[in-house]
From Swiss-Prot:
This is Calretinin. GO terms for cellular component: cytosol; dendriole; gap junction; parallel fiber to Purkinje cell synapse; presynapse. Residues 16-51, 63-98, 107-142, 151-186, 195-230, 235-270 form the EF-hand domain. The gene is Calb2. Ca(2+) 1 binds at D29, D31, N33, Y35, E40. One of its GO terms (molecular function) is calcium ion binding involved in regulation of presynaptic cytosolic calcium ion concentration. Ca(2+) 4 binds at D164, N166, D168, K170, E175. It holds the Pfam family EF-hand_7. Its main location: other. Ca(2+) 3 binds at D120, D122, S124, Y126, E131. Belongs to the calbindin family. Widely expressed in central nervous system. Expressed in type I unipolar brush cells of the cerebellum (at protein level).
Length: 271
């Protein structure tokens, strides 16, 4: 049995498989909060520097603080002082690089919601393992990337392990949305405004005046504005248009049904 001193290096500049990428992530994201930050980030950066020196890649500056600042400016895309898993995927070369593959083909939040609508076939608010497999298969075909059944199974299991935070074998919309680029992830904007089922039912009933069970685009506009005002958050016209377009991707023929909007706005998807 290998002792502590015999552990393999966690960071190197060779090509990585999806599983190896996940191992590196989990090693540095010690508290499992979905980010590398603080001491975790320092440890990650020190390992990265060692790997670069070992492969002959040298930084311009010898000062650790300056190097770290330069590194963060390059890779911390949303400037929050943390590195997210998807940001890390751009730093570490991976053989499959499925996260970048995903982003290439589902680049906007509206496209993401359309894809979600297609694969959440039972409208449960989750994509389960078998639905996720179809999702990834489609993406790989679009990218013209050859794969076999075992490889597809590995991708599916790896993404489940990455994003299935509660380990129930399925991914909720907010979990899956972490695959989106940060600037496109409109669902992050709703994180602090998640509603209970009772709160959601009250606000939906208010805007669904005729009790039809759905609202249209204009009613959604008013509902989103109302939600933002109640939470004392600012939203400009451009943001409103983007959010509305993304949410309306779940609609059928311009009709946004209660269950679909509940997936976006509720703290727990409908059961």
């Amino acid at each position: 049995m290998a002792g502590p001193q015999q552990q393999p290096p966690y960071l190197h500049l060779a090509e990585l498989t999806a599983s190896q990428f996940l191992e590196i992530w989990k090693h540095f994201d010690a508290d499992g909060n979905g980010y590398i930050e603080g001491k975790e980030l320092e440890n990650f950066f020190q390992e990265l520097e060692k790997a670069r020196k070992g492969s002959g890649m040298m930084s311009k500056s010898d000062n650790f603080g300056e190097k770290m600042k330069e590194f963060m400016q390059k890779y911390d895309k949303n400037s929050d002082g943390k590195i997210e898993m998807a940001e890390l995927a751009q730093i570490l070369p991976t053989e499959e690089n499925f996260l970048l593959c995903f982003r290439q083909h589902v680049g906007s939040s509206a496209e993401f919601m359309e894809a979600w609508r297609k694969y959440d076939t039972d409208r449960s608010g989750y994509i389960e393992a078998n639905e996720l497999k179809g999702f990834l298969s489609d993406l790989l075909k679009k990218a013209n990337r050859p794969y076999d059944e075992p490889k597809l199974q590995e991708y599916t299991q790896t993404i489940l392990r990455m994003f299935d935070l509660n380990g129930d074998g399925k991914l909720g919309l907010s979990e899956m949305s972490r695959l989106l680029p940060v600037q496109e992830n409109f669902l992050l904007k709703f994180q602090g405004m998640k509603l209970t089922s009772e709160e959601f039912n009250a606000i939906f009933t208010f805007y669904d005046k005729d009790g039809s069970g759905y609202i249209d685009e204009n009613e959604l506009d008013a509902l989103l504005k109302d939600l933002y005002e109640k939470n004392k958050k600012e939203m400009n016209i451009q943001q409103l248009t983007t959010y509305r377009k993304s949410v309306m991707s779940l609609a059928e023929a311009g009709k946004l049904y209660r269950k679909d909007l509940e997936i976006v706005l509720c703290s727990e998807p409908p059961v």
